[in-house]
Amino acid sequence: MIAFASAEPQDVAPYLGHLARFCESGNLVDRWKKHPGGNHPDGWGIAYRQEDEIRTIRSGVPAASDPLLGQLQVRTDRFVGHVRFASNPDTVRAENSHPFAWKGIALAHNGTFYGKVGEEGDARKVSDTLVFLELLSERWKERTLPGLSVALRDMLSDAEMVGKYSAANLLIATGERLFALRRYRRDDEYYTLYARTGKKTTIVASQPLDGGPGWRLMENGELLEFAGAHSPSALLAGLP
């Protein structure tokens, strides 16, 4: 996963290149069976802000081999990108690629939810992430960092709702606001999120995008708002 917020619109082509690289060789848990086409070959998607709207483009084709990726010409100041490793290969199609968009919120997720969220996803034959997003849109009343912190804490503490989820690494965009949550229950070396903040651009990615300085590993339970050099964060401590 990759997301950035910048003071001025910028070309997303370099970030699309990183998505293609993550598709081919991004981190993978050793015990997982590798799928044909790379480490994360089961579709890709982006969400970006244009004219105060969040727009999405999604594909069920591996990012590393999809010609659409190289054809996109997008400049934006808010961006979310995701390449997918599907726990169930039968679900690989564009409509199951992240990010999902619902009622003005875009959400990309690494991990799997169980409980009622997972059951509803199976019954509707949709992603558990989409079901989670629909619930989040109802519960997130105040579209701020404190408001999101309350909503996510309540949802992730509800074992009946999300079960013993593997991780809730989330990138969340709404309007001009962009947030990242790193939350894992296992496989900490896989469910990573690194942040680099600056005056003009804040970036969060599953792995550092380059060897330059400034990357830091987000804490487990850390919720970060993209807001320049002094991006605020909250720690959702004590989650089950």
List each language-model region with its residue ranges.
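Extreme N-terminus nucleophile/cap motif
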Residues: 1-62, 180, 185-188, 221-223, ...
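Short helix/loop capping segments that flank catalytic or ligand/cofactor-binding pockets
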Residues: 13, 56, 89-91, 109, ...
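Domain-scale activation on soluble regions of proteins
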Residues: 36-41, 50-60, 75, 113, ...
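Short, basic and Ser/Thr-rich N-terminal targeting/leader segments
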Residues: 40-44, 50, 63-64, 74, ...
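Conserved catalytic micro-motifs used in adenylation/nucleotidyl-transfer and phosphoryl/amide-
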Residues: 46, 96-113, 157-207, 212-217, ...
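Short acidic (Asp/Glu) patches
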Residues: 58-73, 81-103, 116
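A short, polar/proline- and glycine-enriched secondary-structure boundary/capping micro-motif
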Residues: 65-70, 119-121, 189-195, 214-217, ...
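Short histidine
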Residues: 114-177
